[in-house]
Structures are given as structure tokens and as C-alpha cells.
Amino acid sequence: SVFVFKTVSDQFGKQTYFKVMSGTLRRDMTLKNSASGSEEKMAHFYSPCGKKQTEYEVMHAGDIGVISKLVRTATNDTLSQSGTLTFRKIDFPEPYMAKSVVASGKGDEDKIAASILKLTDEDPTLKFENNAETKQMLIYGMGDMQLDVAVSRLKSRYGVTVQTGEPEIAYRETIKKRVQVEGKHKKQSGGSGQYGHVKI
């Protein structure tokens, strides 16, 4: 069984970092994701050491590995042969600071959304929201520096340039109590005239 503790996304694809928690992992072994229920083939996995990666055919409990092309696996997922095993997840803090992001060029909104979602795969403390009330795209993080780094990565990795601003607040009103209102309308202009009496 393996536990996914990190995901790295760039313009070339996604790399998934994992730790072998129990048993033995062999090349081409098929494991089931306990979160999504999907099966993933562990075709080629490597042991990372700085920028160098060494491919292995077998890994044992305690080994750290990296693999690409896992389609339905994210950080905090557990993969095992039975698919019923789930290891304790890493507790990431909830992001609290938001900035609006606006495309610098026309028609780049879909590209921006797709690129930000790749960043959120990599950093679980980032969050993306397309706010239906304010019609704004919002990116949430733990502070200004993290959000600035995210915007910089959008440009350097995916070629997406955005402008940031303050998010708008969607104000709401609600009915607090029951009231009654009465109104009368009178108009006399020499003819039959007009009269109305309304209660609400």
C-alpha cells in the first residue's frame, strides 16, 4: 500500500510523490484508490534524489517514490490492492485570503481556470472559486506572498498572465419580521374619478 503526500504539476504533466507504507510495490502492479475507487497502474516509478531520479522495479515499505500519469489520484490518497485501506490524511490549513484574477487577454478565462486548478493539485492550501454571485474568479491562499508566487507560476509555467484585485462582496438582505402596510389612492378630475385601497 502507498500514501500520496505530494503532487507536482507543470506544463509537461503531473508527478505524484508517494511513500510505500506496507508490503512490496512492483512494476506494473495495479492498485485501487480508496477515495475515488479507481484503479491505477504503477507502470514506471522512480526514487527521487535532488534533480536525479532512479527507476526501480521493486520498492519496499518505507521507500519514497515518484510516478507520473496517475489520472485520478491526488495528495492525501491511499492506494492499495484491496482499495479498502485509508491512511490518516495530512491536515492542511484552510486558506483565508482571497484575490480576484482577471485575464489580461480576451478569451483566456478557461485557460486561467485550468492552470489554477493544476496549482491547487500541487498546493492544497490554495483554493480556486468561480463566484457566481459576483462573476469573479477568486484564488484563495494563506497570505499575499503565496498568492503572488501562484500568479508568478501561472505566467512562468503555463504562459498565463493575469491581473489581481480585491474581491467584491455579495451583500444579501433577508426578511426579519412580518409587517402590514396599507395605502389608498384617490384621484378626482371631474369625471368618475379613481379610488384604490391596498393592504399588504
Q: For each predicted feature, which ranges?
A:
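Conserved nucleotide-binding/hydrolysis modules and their immediate coupling elements
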Residues: S1-A98, A113, Q136
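Conserved cytochrome P450 K-helix/beta-meander segment immediately N-terminal to the heme-binding cysteine loop
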Residues: I200
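Charged, conformationally dynamic linker/hinge segments
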Residues: S82-G196
